[in-house]
């Protein structure tokens, strides 16, 4: 990983600092992620992993430092930055009373990526939920609910994916499926920044590890 903003780097963090209450989670944190690269963010609970991801997707502001997309501070980009970035939080945002299709379509619409019912059903089928598309989320297992949230990765057109614990509650087959989706995005020049407590071997792409303490 390299440091400092540059027009040729796709996502760059420079001297980030994050304070929560009286606790400094991290400071002077700098890195860059380029097309085709994956960065794993690790560290113990409470080290600031989720806080960092929220900074990178613009949901929170750093106490110090800057984040650049293609050489421009993301605070100046506004909606233009959200148009190139997909963020999936660790809770998934799944609503119990909505069907799998409804959950997927609404989450896509909120992210600025409208899809029709057929597209939603196709994505859910690809991610292993064929036959469960019209079931209310309340009857789905935790792993199936997670798949509904992750199905958005199959329809998004964004280059940068920021994923908070995407593998939580997934079985081995589902993890391998998500691994293939990530590799496909990276092969097209996409970028992935993610946290995970599970080991994920990615032998065909450039992988960085950022460990918070």
UniProtKB/Swiss-Prot annotation:
Topology of the protein relative to the lipid bilayer: Peripheral membrane protein
Oligomeric form and interacting partners: The complex is composed of two ATP-binding proteins (CcmA) and two transmembrane proteins (CcmB).
The entry's keywords: ATP-binding, Cell inner membrane, Cell membrane, Cytochrome c-type biogenesis, Membrane, Nucleotide-binding, Translocase, Transport
Reported function: Part of the ABC transporter complex CcmAB involved in the biogenesis of c-type cytochromes; once thought to export heme, this seems not to be the case, but its exact role is uncertain. Responsible for energy coupling to the transport system.
Reactions catalysed: heme b(in) + ATP + H2O = heme b(out) + ADP + phosphate + H(+)
Domain ABC transporter: 11-213
GO BP field: cytochrome complex assembly
Transcription found in the keyword field: no
PANTHER family assigned to the protein according to its UniProt record, in alphabetical order: ABC TRANSPORTER I FAMILY MEMBER 1
Annotated ATP binding sites: 43-50
GO MF terms, alphabetically ordered: ABC-type heme transporter activity; ATP binding; ATP hydrolysis activity
Location within or outside the cell: Cell inner membrane
One Pfam family linked to the record: ABC_tran
Protein name: Cytochrome c biogenesis ATP-binding export protein CcmA
Keyword Glycosyltransferase found: no
EC number(s) from the headed UniProt entry: 7.6.2.5
Gene coding for it: ccmA
Family assignment from sequence similarity: Belongs to the ABC transporter superfamily. CcmA exporter (TC 3.A.1.107) family.
UniProt xrefs under InterPro entries: AAA+_ATPase (IPR003593), ABC_transporter-like_ATP-bd (IPR003439), ABC_transporter-like_CS (IPR017871), ABC_transptr_haem_export_CcmA (IPR005895), P-loop_NTPase (IPR027417)
One annotated Gene Ontology cellular component of this protein: plasma membrane
Location, primary (coarse class): membrane
Organism this protein belongs to: Nitrosomonas europaea (strain ATCC 19718 / CIP 103999 / KCTC 2705 / NBRC 14298)
Gene3D superfamilies per record: P-loop containing nucleotide triphosphate hydrolases
PROSITE patterns assigned to the protein according to its UniProt record, in alphabetical order: ABC_TRANSPORTER_1, ABC_TRANSPORTER_2, CCMA
């Amino acid at each position: 990983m390299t440091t400092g903003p540059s027009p040729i780097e796709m996502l760059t963090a420079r001297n980030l600092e994050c304070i929560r209450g009286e606790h400094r989670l991290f400071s002077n944190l700098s890195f860059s992620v380029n097309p085709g690269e994956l960065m794993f963010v690790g560290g113990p609970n409470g080290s600031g992993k989720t806080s960092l991801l929220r900074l990178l997707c613009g949901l929170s502001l750093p106490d110090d430092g800057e984040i650049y997309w293609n050489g421009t501070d993301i605070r100046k980009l506004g909606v233009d930055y959200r148009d190139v970035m997909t963020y999936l939080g660790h809770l998934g945002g799944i609503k119990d009373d909505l069907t799998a299709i409804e959950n997927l379509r609404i989450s896509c619409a909120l992210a600025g990526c409208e899809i029709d019912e057929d597209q939603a059903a196709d994505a859910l089928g690809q991610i292993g939920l064929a036959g469960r598309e019209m079931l209310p989320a309340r009857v789905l297992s935790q792993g199936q609910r997670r798949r509904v949230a992750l199905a958005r990765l199959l329809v998004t057109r964004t280059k940068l994916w920021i994923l908070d614990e995407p593998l939580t509650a997934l079985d081995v087959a589902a993890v391998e499926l998500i691994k293939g989706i990530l590799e496909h995005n990276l092969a097209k020049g996409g970028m992935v920044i993610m946290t995970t407590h599970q080991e994920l071997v990615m032998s065909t792409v450039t992988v960085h590890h950022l460990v918070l303490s």
